[in-house]
UniProtKB/Swiss-Prot annotation:
SMART domains: Filament. PANTHER family: INTERMEDIATE FILAMENT PROTEIN IFA-1, LAMIN DM0-RELATED. The lineage of its organism: Eukaryota, Metazoa, Ecdysozoa, Nematoda, Chromadorea. Residues 105-118 are annotated as: Linker 1. Keywords: Coiled coil, Cytoplasm, Intermediate filament. It comes from the Eukaryota. Residues 1-30, 45-72 are annotated as: Disordered. This is Intermediate filament protein ifa-1. GO terms for molecular function: structural constituent of cytoskeleton. Signal peptide: none annotated. Residues 257-274 are annotated as: Linker 12. Belongs to the intermediate filament family. The gene is ifa-1. Isoform d is abundantly expressed in the marginal cells of the pharynx, forming apicobasally oriented thick filament bundles that are attached to the apical and basal plasma membrane by hemi-adherens junctions. Expression of isoform c is also seen in the excretory cells and in the uterus. Isoform c is detectable in the amphid sensory neurins and the pharyngeal-intestinal valve. Both isoform c and isoform d are expressed in the rectum and vulva and in some neurons of the tail.
Length: 575
């Protein structure tokens, strides 16, 4: 009976990290007599090469297990007795592969238990990492929800501020309308006051004229009184003259009578007496007639003058009373208008003060509104960056979890497929390919593996204003600037972009004069020979072929005054 030996393979880890970085490419050779097993892994982002843990374990355990294989032969022969009927057709092949089977199956002993314990520990660590990741994810989701609530609160406050601003504007418009109405009313009152003052002036002139006419009438009255006295004197004189003439006539009559009496002839005496009587009667009638005419004329003229003076005086008194009443009324109205004007002026000053206070309040509200908008935009940018970082980190954790799940499944298949040794090489290659596939999805960090070392890159950026450094190539090929404002263009002409490498070397690029970065747009600046200039979206830094790369790279944007407006810090650490 032919003996068929069964050997076991064990894998142990001697690296500090207990697991090779995912996505690396390692090559290891395992040689046993005339059979060599080659394990190949791919490494997409590494910078060096080394033996994988499987190759190192295979090479180290083959030499140590040869003496032990001889002791385990008898035990393995007993265990493989049940397979004799199944492998009779492989007897010739078994003789040829006996040495290889002894070398390969010698690994499946206590080393398998060590591998199981090692990967069970890694599974526990991976489960803890998954739990911590889920916990962090829940915390981040809580923080995100809290930030969303704060954002909703800020939006509500912004809407309230906007409504208050609209109400203030409506109130200011109403006050302006009231002010314009009051100003129009004040202007109308001023015109009415001017008209009333003109009317008062005219009435004063009319009153002065009436006073002048009254004075003239009084003068005329005095003159007429003097004339009346003069006429009365003339009448008295005439009466006296008449009395004198009467006396003279009486004397003449007496003389004539005397003469007549001397005439002895009765006919003559009678004749002269009759003639004298007739003459006296005629004279008396003529005198009475003249006297009556003069008296009637004087009386009618006097009555007429007195009536005219009385009528004119009554009219002047009436007009003067009317003028006094009108002046009194106008003075009362003027006093009322002046009081109303004072009230309107005080109200106008109060309204102007209120308008000034509302303008100040409006300016404060506008400044608060702009500050709230800027704060909200900065918080939104910060939350977007944090969300992006959380999404990237979450994607990394999910990729790590998928990788660990794939490794666990493959190692479980390897442990369960202990009896079937034909697919060992395919399983190892599947593990390696899985590593390579999962490494390609890692976008946040880049691992460079050489032997047992790895490096990690991280970045941090900040901005004061709307212009930020959106992206900076780690190899220094390009830098991207972004205007985060949705409506405002930014003039960044003659701004300086400095890139400091490891605190030593520094490259400076000055943007063209009068360059404007449009709202919501980006500007990509290439190093020399790394891109084509296409303003305003692309520019070229002609001084260097690269902006520079290193372990600690700081990219800083300065304005024309030398103030720092945006930063982008890249760090690369080695573990």
């Amino acid at each position: 009976m032919m003996e068929i030996t069964r050997e076991t393979m064990s894998f142990t880890s001697t690296t500090p990290s207990a697991r090779a970085p995912l996505g690396g490419r390692t090559t290891g050779n395992v040689t046993s007599q005339d059979r060599m097993l080659k394990i190949v892994t791919e490494m997409r982002s590494g910078a060096g090469s080394g033996l994988s843990p499987f190759g190192q374990n295979a090479a180290s355990t083959i030499r140590d297990s040869r003496e032990r294989e001889k002791k385990e032969m008898s035990d393995l022969n007993d265990r493989l007795a049940s397979y004799i009927e199944k492998v009779r057709f492989l007897e010739a092949q078994n003789r040829k592969l006996a040495a290889d089977l002894d070398a390969l199956r010698s690994k499946w002993g206590k080393d398998t238990h060590n591998i199981r314990n090692m990967y069970e520990g890694e599974l526990v660590d991976a489960q803890k990492l998954i739990d911590e990741t889920n916990k962090q994810r829940k915390d981040m989701e809580g923080q995100l929800k809290k930030m969303q609530d704060e954002l909703a609160e800020m939006r509500r406050k912004l809407e309230d501020a906007t409504k208050g601003r609209e109400q203030d504007r409506a109130k200011i418009d109403a006050l302006l309308v009231t002010l314009s109405n009051l100003e129009a009313e004040i202007s109308l009152l001023k015109r009415r006051i001017a008209q009333l003052e003109d009317e008062v002036k005219r009435i004063k002139q009319e009153n002065q004229r009436l006073l002048s006419e009254l004075q003239r009438a009084r003068t005329d009255l005095d003159q007429e009184t003097l004339n009346r006295i003069d006429y009365q004197n003339q009448v008295q004189t005439l009466l006296e003259e008449i009395d004198f003439l009467r006396r003279v006539h009486d004397n003449e009559i007496k003389e004539l009578q005397t003469l007549a009496s001397r005439d002895t002839t009765p006919e003559n005496r009678e004749f002269f007496k009759n003639e004298l009587s007739s003459a006296i009667r005629d004279i008396r009638e003529e005198y009475d007639q003249v006297n009556n005419v003069h008296r009637n004329d004087m009386e009618s003229w006097y009555r007429l003058k007195v009536q005219e003076i009385q009528t004119q005086s009554a009219r002047q008194n009436m007009e003067q009373g009317y003028a006094k009443e009108e002046v009194k009324r106008l003075r009362t109205q003027l006093s009322d208008l002046r009081g109303k004007l004072a009230d309107l002026e005080s109200r106008n000053s109060l309204l102007e003060k209120q308008i000034q206070e509302l303008n100040y309040q409006l300016e404060d509200d506008q400044r608060s509104y702009e500050a709230a908008l800027n704060d909200r935009d900065s918080q939104i940018r910060k939350m977007r960056e944090e969300c992006q970082a959380l999404m990237v980190e979450l994607q990394m954790l999910l990729d790590t979890k998928q990788t660990l799940d794939a490794e666990i499944a493959i190692y479980r298949k390897m442990l369960e497929g202990e009896e079937n040794r034909a697919g060992l090489k395919q399983l190892v290659e599947q593990v390696v390919k899985t590593h390579a596939i999962t490494q390609e999805t890692d976008t946040e960090t880049m691992r460079v593996v050489k032997g047992e070392t790895a490096s990690r890159q991280s970045f941090q950026r900040s901005a004061k204003g709307n212009v930020s450094i959106h992206e900076a190539s780690p190899d220094g090929k390009f830098i991207v600037l972004q205007n985060t404002h949705r409506a405002k263009d930014e003039a960044i002409g003659e701004w300086k972009l400095k890139r400091r490498i490891d605190g030593k070397r520094e490259n400076v690029y000055t943007l063209p004069r009068d360059f404007v970065l449009r709202a919501g747009k980006t500007l990509k600046i290439f190093a020399r020979n790394q891109g084509v200039a296409s303003p305003p979206d692309q520019l070229v830094y002609d001084a260097e072929d690269s902006f520079g790369s290193g372990n600690n790279v700081q990219t800083i944007l300065f304005n024309k005054e030398g103030e720092e407006r945006a930063t982008h810090i890249q760090r690369q650490s080695t573990a």
